[in-house]
Amino acid sequence: MSENPQSAPAQRYTAELAGQIETKWQDRWEELGTFYADNPTGDLAGPLASHNPFFILDMFPYPSGKGLHVGHPLGYIATDTLARYRRMKGDNVLYTMGYDAFGLPAEQYAVQTGQHPAITTNQNIANMRRQLRRMGLSHDSRRSFATTDIEYVHWTQWIFLQVFNSWFDPEATAPDGSQGAARPITELIAKLESGEIRPEDGSDYNSLDRAAQAKVVDSYRLAYVSEAPVNWCPGLGTVLANEEVTADGRSERGNYPVFKRNLRQWMMRITAYGKRLSDDLDTINWPEKVRTMQRNWIGRSEGATVRFDVPGAREAGASLDSLDVYTTRPDTLFGATFMVVAPEHPILGGTVGGDAGDEAALTLPASWPEGTKDAWTGGAASPKEAVSAYRAQAAAKSEAERADEERTKTGVFTGLFGIDPVNGRAVPIFVADYVLWGYGTGAIMAVPAHDDRDWAFARAYDLDIVRTIGPADDPYGHDLEAGAYTGDGVAVDSANDEIDLNGLAKDEAKAAMIEWLVAKGLGHGTVTYRLRDWLFSRQRYWGEPFPIVWDEDGVAHALPEDMLPVELPEVSDYSPRTFDADDADSSPEAPLGRAEDWVNVTLDLGDGPKTYRRETNTMPQWAGSCWYEMRYTDPTNSERFAGEENLAYWMGPREGKVSGGTDMYVGGVEHAVLHLLYARFWQKVLFDLGHVPDSEPYHTLFNQGYVQAYAYTDARGQYVPADEVEGDETTGFTYKGEPVGREYGKMGKSLKNIVTPDEMYDAYGADVFRVYEMSMGPLDLSRPWETRAVVGSQRFLQRLWRNAVDEETGELTVTDEPADDKTRRLVARTIAEVTEEYENLRINTAISKLIVLNNHLTSLDAVPRDAIEPLILMLAPVAPHLCEELWSRLGHEASLAREPFPVVEDSSLLVEDTVTAVIQVNGKVKARIEVAPSISEEDLIAAALAEAPIVKALGGADPLKVIARAPKLVNVVVKK
């Protein structure tokens, strides 16, 4: 810990003095609006808008009741350092902080206490604002807001309506030339009315009643309601997005079991943007790791969609008489020996696809057809009995369990056969839970000879295995009894009267098969995406209400803009109904549904007053975080979510930044396929509709590492307070004299290793805390917190203070005499190097170079002003309070916040010191010359040969050989 201020000289830089300096400058910055960024137009317009804009964004925090621990501010201090540096480079810097304030924790606290979540949320925000202000972050406080602010909710709902009132037209051209774009829903309705587009069932749109027309239109909307398989979590009482479910099929929050259920939910048609979301990753400056994660999540693949007729389906009462399957290997169609559909596939029928207990409603044959093998039936007396029982089992499994590659694959025969279009073969159709409804078409063709999973299933269920590929050098050499052949090769036994693939390699065979399928009207080439539509509703109270009402016919109506915002009603019980965590058959009950006076409402939506029912789901927490950076650009605008000119200034493309978006976005990699993907989707929709200047929200992304910590356990395995542990790795660690074990990981109250910024402010001051966090290592790497190591950063700042101020009197000790040549050269080199380090967010190495300069100044009898002032300016982005204080004491009236960052005005100072090169002739020293340490061998030889003693030794002849070892030696070999 820092030294006792009682024993320190009166003007020593202690935690107490640091606190006085820091709060003084924080108050002054706030009073003067030092960090305000000017807009080109509107309430926040000002002269700084003539400067180059630079928009720095942090992933904004959730206002937790626990406040911050020392791990949270790592990215914030880094972005503040960058913001301060860019201001000193002359930029108009937009840098602020809002709060992602809707969400489950505040609601759960409200459930426990009965206190409205808005109260605890606002209290938490106030505490976090206090902690961040005390840290000295240079935020433009005018631009701060919470996603729960009613004006912000207004525009979140407005953006939702833009998505709801749009459809994806694959023929439209986006403003950036991309194929396929969002268009107003009115254009779709016009195309339906004109007959240019027809409903999927081929009916006449104009002959449909109002409800049927609405159903057709809704099937195209980018925001729509779907009764589809979703992730139902009884323990939380809500549904979850795929991304909120862990790999082992449990909720990320609370670790409850998650089940697949068919439920009515709001969805966002993000899949329509799969190609653009994937392609445009090449236009942004993101870590390759994150781009790869998004590409894998989007999951682009190329293949073909093939139609298999199912002749017995209509007879059994099914609504379909064929199955479309997607395959990446259409060249293997001759080897398809069975098909598999997901338990939720509509061809099976049922009361609600995928639900259990609906045997009577299944559209399957009443008895097993001829040729059914015992292994196919699951021991059931009929297809309906077998499939009903199997679907009940599947409904109790999580998606992760069903998709587990290591699990033994199971299934039962449906009693239906599909007809392979290439050879007319009748192949049995199974239902199996490893096929997921929502991926592809929910149906697959199985080629067991060339797929390990299909091969295992075929062996288990006594199904045929037919070869269609083999190694080029021995097409029939692989033993299919031993396993599938999954390598490349050439096609074999793959011909009919119209197409012959035999002997073709994979790509040629695929192309030929797709061409044949298209010509015959049996299929077409297809690009598919693993990405699925975004589940966009929650059975929660503390979220944005949907600006949607439902009429008596079940038709959804968007509220007009003059009815926004829709505010949450006051309710007595904030909790959704939760269930036994393992109750897979339960159904969600949203808390808003209990507010009957709010739910049932009479409105005039243009055709007279009518009674409607409000949507009782709320939006997910992701809604507010999808667009907050745009609101930062124009937070007081009451006419628009953000003004066009202000958006273009801060987020539009410009020289050196071909795609738009924020100049720097810093946050954790854990958001790679959640927030970052959703925000890109909303941005593209708004871009297509002409509301924003570019299709990407974040141009440059930087993922910071994490501050982790050691925790200690005693002999009982109980955690002990980390700050009371003594010892080191050499001597071992003890607590109250007893040995303890050490483990490395996250900070947590239960681990008794939490350290808060408030503790650091009290013990060392904010600047010491900032310097320590930034000097712990490269910003993109995780690092362990060591409170005992903070003193090193304190000593650095204390030495800087002593280099300028007398610790006893507080008087300046700086001299106005010019610095010596050595000092001037070190200052110049430090300026050049620190500038490069700041530009690349290598703040730790910038600090190390500043320490070197400071140590050099400490060694001088008197510290020159022309050396310490550049040092203060260079350190100011990291330790702003101390540097402001020293700058002021050095006689400068204005804040250094916009003081020009030091530059090297005399480039000769960057020329390296010379070294002595020895020049020999036949191994004997003939001359010595001074050269730069970086001189090349070629230049060193030229300089050596020009020296008079060497010219004389050569006597006009060429040397036999010249041996050079730059920069210190040249040996010229001549005839003796």
Enumerate the language-model features and the residues they cover:
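Residue patterns forming the tRNA-binding/recognition surfaces of aminoacyl-tRNA synthetases
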Residues: 2-11, 15-18, 23-24, 28-32, ...
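Amphipathic alpha-helical
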Residues: 26, 267-301, 346-412, 564-597, ...
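Long, charged, mostly alpha-helical binding arms that flank functional sites
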Residues: 12-16, 300-305, 470-473, 479-515, ...
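Helix-rich, typically C-terminal accessory recognition domains appended to large enzymatic cores
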Residues: 100, 171-178, 219, 224-231, ...
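Basic, alpha-helical terminal appendages of large translation-related enzymes
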Residues: 1-49, 444, 464-475, 479-483, ...
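Catalytic alpha/beta core of large soluble enzyme barrels
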Residues: 79-80, 92, 349-472, 477-485
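N-terminal catalytic cores of NTP/NDP-binding nucleotidyl/phosphoryl-transfer enzymes
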Residues: 40-121, 145-156, 325-328, 420-457, ...
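Conserved oxyanion/phosphate-binding beta-strand-loop segments in alpha/beta enzyme cores
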Residues: 6-57, 87-96, 120-126, 286, ...
